[in-house]
């Protein structure tokens, strides 16, 4: 079946944003070995749709450095309330199970890159 997904472009791509739910949030996000960017969103929110496109664009660029998860606040109210999400889109940056940064509203791509680079610096390549 995965061969057909690959041919049709439906296979998971490295860095593709993943869904987290009330049931999976702790395991997927808080216990992640990699730093995590969580996009709290709703399908009825137009700025959220724009941010979703930015997340899909950034995902492959940060694959292996940052996991990106999306939480639909309409379907996962417990997690949204737990993180005191009052406005969407809200981006929460988590490292070692702790919030280290947060942004609300439509955020420019360069700001997202700066925050992600701060969250998970690129490895330094040294010439030998």
Language-model regions, residue ranges each:
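Glycine-rich phosphate-binding loop
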Residues: 87
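Proteins that catalyze or organize thiol-disulfide redox chemistry
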Residues: 1-37, 42-65, 77-78, 90, ...
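Structural microenvironment flanking redox-active thiols in thiol-disulfide oxidoreductases
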Residues: 71-81
């Amino acid at each position: 079946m995965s061969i057909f997904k690959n041919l049709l472009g439906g296979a998971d791509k490295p860095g593709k944003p993943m869904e987290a739910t009330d049931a999976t949030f702790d395991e997927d996000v808080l216990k992640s070995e990699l730093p995590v960017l969580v996009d709290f969103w709703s399908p009825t929110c137009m700025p959220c749709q724009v941010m979703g496109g930015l997340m899909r664009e950034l995902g492959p660029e940060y694959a292996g450095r940052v996991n990106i998860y999306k939480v639909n606040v309409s379907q996962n109210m417990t997690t949204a309330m737990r993180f005191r999400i009052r406005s969407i889109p809200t981006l929460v940056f988590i490292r070692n199970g702790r919030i280290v940064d947060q942004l609300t509203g439509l955020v420019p791509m360069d700001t997202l890159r700066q925050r992600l680079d701060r969250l998970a610096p690129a490895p330094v390549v040294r010439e030998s």
